[in-house]
A protein has these predicted regions:
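Metal-dependent phosphoesterase signature
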Residues: 53-80
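Metal-dependent phosphoesterase core characteristic of DEDDh/y 3'-5' exonuclease domains
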Residues: 4-8, 18-24, 28-58, 81-217
């Protein structure tokens, strides 16, 4: 299947091992278009200290009025079965957050593995395709590939007014989605399969495509 035909669920979480997930955001994309999105804050597992409030840009008192992330079980189980792949920027972090709450999804498609994968990883893809960049942070990639204006446009449409900046869950998920969608305009990648993109997301020589085939920059 061509990757553009796949339904991709782009996810971002804000939180830590200590606090648990304090905010989630996801964007479902298909044929380079956003088909749905959702975001919400979550009641943390532990009281946020001032440093964490500053880091997340969230107030503990306000967060305490929200449901815990564990109450979102059905949402994420259903999301997993509704998409062909999950996607995140540094997907191991998002996968570990999910596993903190639910080690594996209890709902699966026929022949789907008992895991939260497969994952596209925008950080790994860009490391493999553009190895000379050096900085693969989400904000740097958005700036490097002139996605700032489109990100602001999408954020104004989908994000709450107070959560339209980096390190806000839906904002970052939208940024990752743009990094995937821009490949539709690159002929060498636009025609590739979903399996190719999954291999480009992998780390390690045995799992990765030949870098000579991948490197574009």
């Amino acid at each position: 299947m061509n990757w553009q035909k796949a339904k991709i669920g782009v996810i971002d979480f804000e939180g830590s091992v200590r606090t648990g997930i304090v905010e989630y955001g996801y964007v479902a994309i298909n044929r380079s278009k956003i088909i749905n999105s959702e975001t919400s804050c979550c009641n943390p597992s532990k009281t946020l200290v001032p440093e964490e409030e500053k880091s997340f840009g969230l107030d503990h008192t306000a967060l305490s009025t929200h449901a815990h992330f564990s109450d979102k079980r059905e949402l994420f189980m259903n999301l997993h079965t509704s998409v062909d792949v999950f996607c995140a920027h540094h997907s191991a972090i998002e996968e570990n957050f999910l596993k903190m709450h639910w080690p594996y999804p209890t709902k699966r498609k026929l022949f789907q593995a008992a895991s939260w994968g497969p994952w596209l990883d925008t950080r790994k893809i860009y490391e493999n395709l553009y190895p000379s960049l050096g900085d693969f942070s989400l904000s740097h990639l958005v700036q490097t590939f002139d996605l700032d204006e489109k990100l602001r446009e999408n954020a104004s449409k989908y994000c709450p007014p107070e959560r339209r900046e980096p390190h806000c869950a839906l904002y970052d998920a939208l940024a990752s989605a743009l990094l995937i969608n821009r490949f539709k305009d690159i002929p060498e990648i636009a025609c590739t399969s979903l399996e190719w993109m999954l291999q480009a997301s992998a780390s390690g020589k045995k799992k990765r495509l030949d870098l000579d085939q991948l490197s574009l920059f």
